[in-house]
Amino acid sequence: MNDEDYSTIYDTIQNERTYEVPDQPEENESPHYDDVHEYLRPENDLYATQLNTHEYDFVSVYTIKGEETSLASVQSEDRGYLLPDEIYSELQEAHPGEPQEDRGISMEGLYSSTQDQQLCAAELQENGSVMKEDLPSPSSFTIQHSKAFSTTKYSCYSDAEGLEEKEGAHMNPEIYLFVKAGIDGESIGNCPFSQRLFMILWLKGVVFNVTTVDLKRKPADLHNLAPGTHPPFLTFNGDVKTDVNKIEEFLEETLTPEKYPKLAAKHRESNTAGIDIFSKFSAYIKNTKQQNNAALERGLTKALKKLDDYLNTPLPEEIDANTCGEDKGSRRKFLDGDELTLADCNLLPKLHVVKIVAKKYRNYDIPAEMTGLWRYLKNAYARDEFTNTCAADSEIELAYADVAKRLSRS
C-alpha cells in the first residue's frame, strides 16, 4: 500500500477517531516519567509464568523486592478455545506436528474500518474482572506498580534480541505502550485496539514496556502526557503517538529488517477479510426486539461465512497445478499465510470478542461447519502473541454487560 493510500484512509478517519484528540502536544519528552522511572530496574520486580498451551491454565509467580507470592487460576472451562471434536480431529490429521513459529512475513499495510473503531469504543466499558497475567517465556518481563499511574508495567525482551538490546540499549528505541487496565486497575483490560498494538510490538521482537492505565482514577500525569486521550497510545523515544492506524504504519516503517521482521501484507484481500464482522456483531448484540433477532443473527453468520470462504480459498502461492479434487482447499494457518501479520493483529482481537460475547448473551456459537474459521482460531489460540495479550473471558463479558440488550417482544 503506498503513501497515497495511507493518506486517504487517515483523512477518512481523522475526524471520527474515538481514541484520538488531534494536535496533541508532545509533553514529557524524557523517555518516561521521573516519578516512576526508578521502578523500571529489572532487579526491583521480576515476573515468571508457566502456561499450558493445551488447557490454557496458568500459574503466575511474582518476586517483588524479595517477597514471593503465587497466583493460580484455571480458565479452560470458560475460554472455549478448543474446536468442536470433529473439526479438531480433522485439523490434527491435516496438520500433524506443525511447528508454531514466531516470525512475521512481508505484508501490505492494514487498517481497521472507522466504523469498527467507533462501535468498539462505544461498547468497551470500564467494568471487568481480573485478567490472567500469563506473559510467558521466551520473552522475559519486568513488572512495576506505579503509584502515580496506578498501573502495571511489563518490559518485554525478545530472546533473539535480549543480549544485543542490553549491550546496545542506547541504539534502540524506548517504547512505552499505554493500554486500558482491567477491573483490578492493573491487569490488561478489554480493548481490541490495545491488543492490536501489543501484538504488533511482540511480533516485532522489540524491547518495550506496557503500562496498564486505570481510567477510573484518571491520573494527572497521564493527562499531562496525552490530554483528553484514552488508551491505547504509546511514546516512542519520548514522542507521543495516539492514532492506532498511524502507530501501526509508523512501527512498520521504523522497525524494519534486518533487525525487525516486516509484518505488512502481501495480499490486499487479507487486509479486508472479515472487515464487516464487528459491525454485524454490534447490531446483533445491541438489538432488543425479538422479531429482529433472527435476521441480525443471519447477518452475522453471513459475514463469518465470508471470512470462512476466504480462509478456505488457496492463496496464489498455495495453488499447485498438480493438485486436484478436495486437496484444492487452503491449509494456511492465518489470513495471509502461515505467519501472523498486521491483518491478524487487527482482526483476531475483534473476532475473539465476537466469539465470547455472542455466546454469553445470545447463546450463539460460530457454526462448526466453518472449518476455515475454526482452523484460523485454533492456530491463533496456539500463539502466545495472541493468547497472552487477550483480556480474560470474564473481563470481556463484563465489559459488554451494559451493551448487550435483553430481547423483548415489544
Swiss-Prot record:
SUPFAM superfamilies for this protein: GST C-terminal domain-like, Thioredoxin-like
Transmembrane residue ranges: 193-213
Domain GST C-terminal, first and last residues per copy: 260-400
Tissue specificity of this protein: Widely expressed in both fetal and adult human tissues. Isoform 1 is expressed in renal glomeruli endothelial cells and podocytes (at protein level).
EC number(s) on file: 1.8.-.-
Name of one Pfam family that matches: CLIC-like_N
Keyword Cell membrane: yes
Gene Ontology MF terms in the entry: chloride channel activity; oxidoreductase activity
Keyword Transport in annotation: yes
CDD domains found in the cross-reference section: GST_C_CLIC5, GST_N_CLIC
Gene Ontology cellular-component annotations: actin cytoskeleton; apical plasma membrane; cell cortex; centrosome; chloride channel complex; extracellular exosome; Golgi apparatus; mitochondrion
One record GO biological process: chloride transport
Motif (G-site): 191-194
PROSITE patterns reported in the protein's UniProt record: GST_CTER (PS50405)
Keywords on record: Cell membrane, Cell projection, Chloride, Chloride channel, Cytoplasm, Cytoskeleton, Deafness, Golgi apparatus, Hearing, Ion channel, Ion transport, Membrane, Mitochondrion, Non-syndromic deafness, Oxidoreductase, Sensory transduction, Transmembrane, Transmembrane helix, Transport, Vision, Voltage-gated channel
Activity control mechanisms: Inhibited by F-actin.
Family membership noted in the UniProt record: Belongs to the chloride channel CLIC family.
Subunit composition and interactions: Component of a multimeric complex consisting of several cytoskeletal proteins, including actin, ezrin, alpha-actinin, gelsolin, and IQGAP1. Interacts with AKAP9. Interacts with TPRN. TPRN, CLIC5 and PTPQR form concentric rings at the base of stereocilia and may form a complex. Interacts with EZR, MYO6 and RDX; the proteins may work together as a complex to stabilize linkages between the plasma membrane and subjacent actin cytoskeleton at the stereocilium base.
UniProt function note: In the soluble state, catalyzes glutaredoxin-like thiol disulfide exchange reactions with reduced glutathione as electron donor. Can insert into membranes and form non-selective ion channels almost equally permeable to Na(+), K(+) and Cl(-). Required for normal hearing. It is necessary for the formation of stereocilia in the inner ear and normal development of the organ of Corti. May play a role in the regulation of transepithelial ion absorption and secretion. Is required for the development and/or maintenance of the proper glomerular endothelial cell and podocyte architecture.
Notes on the domains: The active G-site contains a monothiol Cys-X-X-Ser motif which mediates glutathione-dependent redox catalysis.
Disease: Deafness, autosomal recessive, 103: A form of sensorineural deafness with onset in early childhood. Hearing impairment progresses from mild to severe or even profound before the second decade, and is accompanied by vestibular areflexia.
The name this protein goes by in its record: Chloride intracellular channel protein 5
Organism of provenance: Homo sapiens (Human)
Lineage of the organism: Eukaryota, Metazoa, Chordata, Craniata, Vertebrata
Gene name, Swiss-Prot/TrEMBL: CLIC5
